Amino acid sequence: MRAFTRIAVVLLLVPGLVRAQSRPAADTLAASLQSRYQGIKDFTADFVHTYRGGVLRTQTQERGTVMVKRPGRMRWVYSAPERKEFVADGRKIYAYIPEDRQVIVSVVPADDQATTPALFLAGKGDISRDFTAAYADSPDPGTVSLKLTPRKEEPEYEYLIVTIDPVTLQIRALTTRDRQGGDSTLTFSNLQENRGLADKVFAFLIPRGVEVITDGTSK
């Protein structure tokens, strides 16, 4: 699977205040963010996914919608320029690109092994336990950003930068710095919480005639 596609399932968020002299410690904000999202049952949002840099110094932009339900359920649907889906039903994760006629199946990791931001949103992992937090420059006025560095080295990325609304603590953007020096940014809009999403929304039916890859083995 392409590196940009693999980054897609990597996503999360964090808090802050506008003025440096009045803001709490970064680790305190990280704990507040963890607490806030533990109280959210589900949410939906639109997103724009931009990738810049890396070995080939490329720039790519895609867009779509996301639905998340705790614990462990997600559906990322990319609509443009290419359709693809990433679905977690609580037990397994499915990555499907219709053009490739291929579905890649993996297991949702246990809470203490879930270090990607998307899985935190779905009720997996713990920000304070798994990351060290520090303030970072924020891309937009009226927002605050934190840099989250994993306590254990991750093969896919070096660190995350999460940008939030300092009043509501809602996510506005998430940037992932990958091991090739590229930045993958998810920018969120129209975020709505506690919609009462049904579990069936996160069911994935493998299409007929596609190649299914599980644990690196094709079927």
Regions found by a protein language model. Name each.
Residues 1-8:
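Bacterial N-terminal signal peptides that target proteins for export
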Residues 10-20:
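Hydrophobic h-region of N-terminal signal peptides that target proteins for export
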Residues 19-59, 206-219:
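N-terminal leader/targeting segments and the immediate start of mature chains
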Residues 20, 104, 126-216:
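Gly/Pro-enriched, hydrophobic low-complexity segments
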Residues 37, 114-128:
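Short, solvent-exposed helix-to-loop capping segments enriched in aromatics
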Residues 58-64, 182:
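Amphipathic hydrophobic-ligand
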Residues 65-115, 184-185:
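An acidic-aromatic
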